[in-house]
């Protein structure tokens, strides 16, 4: 799995776990809905750590918790 796929899957997983809609997440995190949808649809080439931190804040979690899951254990090395 590529890193952006893992990020998208983790965002969806946490939204489902916390019963938060994507538009609600956008409002609470201060990120435009289009930016979050770009991350979820893997159109965002490189979801930045600042955006991920804002999403974590909107989800009421930490960056450590966000990345501490099996989705990120076997991500592929990505070459440009």
Kindly label every feature range from the protein language model.
Residues 38, 64-80:
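Short, charged recognition helix plus adjacent turn
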Residues 30-46:
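Recognition helix of helix-turn-helix/homeodomain-like DNA-binding domains
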Residues 14, 28, 39, 69:
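Residues in the recognition helix of alpha-helical DNA-binding motifs
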Residues 43-57:
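Short, basic-rich loop-to-helix N-cap that marks the start of a DNA-contacting helix
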Residues 1-21:
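A short, Lys/Arg-rich alpha-helix, primarily the initiator
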Residues 24, 35, 65:
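Residues in the helix-turn-helix
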Residues 15, 26, 56:
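The alpha-helix within a helix-turn-helix
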